[in-house]
């Protein structure tokens, strides 16, 4: 079965914007078609509380696409075009938030970013 590659990057916002806050993604580098992509973003240098946390992606040769965001309290908002396949969750005890994208296809191949 053909594999899809998903590239993970460290996303560190400029210090003058987020002070010492850094975001580190983790997850598998590849997912098979029809499977679920699961990524986790760990927030360090600050608390996950009181902010909105987002997932975005950039397909090869294309612009950025917003996937969705979650507030530290757990409320979410998703891109309507992905809503049926996306779940974003937060774990304040671990200072982490996560993305699950189900039923992946070749169209989901992209660089995935977490951001505040």
Curated annotation (Swiss-Prot):
InterPro entries, A to Z:
Ig-like_dom, Ig-like_dom_sf, Ig-like_fold, Ig_V-set, IgHV
Where does the record place the region Framework-2?
A: 53-69
- Extract the ranges annotated as region (Complementarity-determining-3): 115-116
Q: Where is this region: Complementarity-determining-2?
A: 70-76
Q: Tell me where the signal peptide lies.
A: 1-19
Q: Which SUPFAM superfamilies match?
A: Immunoglobulin
Identify the residues that the record assigns to the Ig-like domain, covering every copy. 20-116
Locate the region Framework-1.
Answer: 20-44
Per UniProt, what is one GO molecular function of this protein?
A: antigen binding
Task: Give the Pyrrolidone carboxylic acid positions (modified residues).
Answer: 20
For this UniProt entry, what is the primary localization, expressed as one broad class?
A: secreted
Could you tell me the keywords of this UniProt record?
Adaptive immunity, Cell membrane, Disulfide bond, Immunity, Immunoglobulin, Immunoglobulin domain, Membrane, Pyrrolidone carboxylic acid, Secreted, Signal
Q: Which GO terms describe its biological process?
A: immune response; immunoglobulin mediated immune response
Q: Where is this region: Framework-3?
A: 77-114
CC per GO annotation: extracellular region; immunoglobulin complex; plasma membrane
Q: Which domain of life is it from?
A: Eukaryota
- Can you say where in the cell this protein is located? Secreted; Cell membrane
Q: Where is this region: Complementarity-determining-1?
A: 45-52
Q: Which cysteines are joined by disulfide bonds?
A: 41-114
Q: What does this protein do?
A: V region of the variable domain of immunoglobulin heavy chains that participates in the antigen recognition. Immunoglobulins, also known as antibodies, are membrane-bound or secreted glycoproteins produced by B lymphocytes. In the recognition phase of humoral immunity, the membrane-bound immunoglobulins serve as receptors which, upon binding of a specific antigen, trigger the clonal expansion and differentiation of B lymphocytes into immunoglobulins-secreting plasma cells.
* Quaternary data: Immunoglobulins are composed of two identical heavy chains and two identical light chains; disulfide-linked.
- Name this polypeptide is given: Immunoglobulin heavy variable 4-59
What taxonomic classification does the UniProt entry list for its organism? Eukaryota, Metazoa, Chordata, Craniata, Vertebrata
């Amino acid at each position: 079965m053909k594999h899809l590659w998903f590239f993970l990057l460290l996303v560190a916002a400029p210090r003058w914007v987020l002070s010492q806050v850094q975001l580190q993604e983790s997850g598998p580098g590849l997912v098979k078609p029809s499977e679920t992509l699961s990524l986790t973003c760990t927030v360090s240098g600050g608390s996950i509380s009181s902010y909105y946390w987002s997932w975005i992606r950039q397909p090869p040769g294309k612009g950025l696409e917003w996937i969705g965001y979650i507030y530290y309290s757990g409320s979410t908002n998703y891109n309507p075009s992905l809503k049926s396949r996306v779940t974003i969750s937060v774990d304040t005890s671990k200072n982490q938030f996560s993305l699950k994208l189900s039923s992946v296809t070749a169209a989901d191949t992209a660089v995935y970013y977490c951001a505040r």
